[in-house]
Swiss-Prot record:
Region of interest: LID: 127-164
Region of interest (NMP), residue spans: 37-66
Gene3D superfamilies associated with the record: P-loop containing nucleotide triphosphate hydrolases
Positions of GTP binding: G17, G19, K20, G21, T22, R128, Y138, N139, R161, R172, T201
Free-text comment about domains: Consists of three domains, a large central CORE domain and two small peripheral domains, NMPbind and LID, which undergo movements during catalysis. The LID domain closes over the site of phosphoryl transfer upon GTP binding. Assembling and dissambling the active center during each catalytic cycle provides an effective means to prevent GTP hydrolysis.
Native species: Mus musculus (Mouse)
Similarity remark: Belongs to the adenylate kinase family. AK3 subfamily.
Keywords, sorted A to Z: Acetylation, GTP-binding, Kinase, Mitochondrion, Nucleotide-binding, Phosphoprotein, Transferase
EC number of the protein: 2.7.4.10
Protein's name in the database: GTP:AMP phosphotransferase AK3, mitochondrial
One GO BP: AMP metabolic process
Amino acid sequence: MGASGRLLRAVIMGAPGSGKGTVSSRITKHFELKHLSSGDLLRQNMLQGTEIGVLAKTFIDQGKLIPDDVMTRLALHELKTLTQCSWLLDGFPRTLPQAEALDKVYQIDTVINLNVPFEVIKQRLTARWIHPASGRVYNIEFNPPKTVGIDDLTGEPLIQREDDKPETVIKRLKAYEAQTEPVLQYYQKKGVLETFSGTETNKIWPHVYSFLQTKVPETTQKASVTP
């Protein structure tokens, strides 16, 4: 097996709608590593009312971004508990100061970057419409309503969430690019950036899978044998 006995320290990056969540869950299903999502970690700490959770909530409540040092403390505190396993960081580091702070404590072996054209992401994210009363979700591409803009069951109008409106999506994608471009350049210079480009998650995944086979042991679950 190409995977060495050394524990893998990995990061996954990708814009909202790039399929990062799907790829991350497939990685943890097939390989012996722990997936650490900064968003999940944040919610968990806020729910438990930890010191860092309370601090983070004060920024969120004011509509502000959580400062780099708070996010770094949050991630490093959790990573301290994961000394015996390989891990995949998702959502952190998101800025250059976060990447540099992480670097002082851990040597990152590989950064998986999902490079999906913004136009494709925009189509994915803006295709979602919902029926507010029931929470029913329609996707114009994969699961469209029988009549455009109308709920199948009630005949009531569908709405588009603020987050899914084209102008909001474009703003989010531009903000992501501005924030993460320096991080990608930083890891590129270190020689650990692996970029996987494509328009479909199912076509990108086999390349990510082959790459990780050389880096980390696969899970020995029987499920991988069954079709």
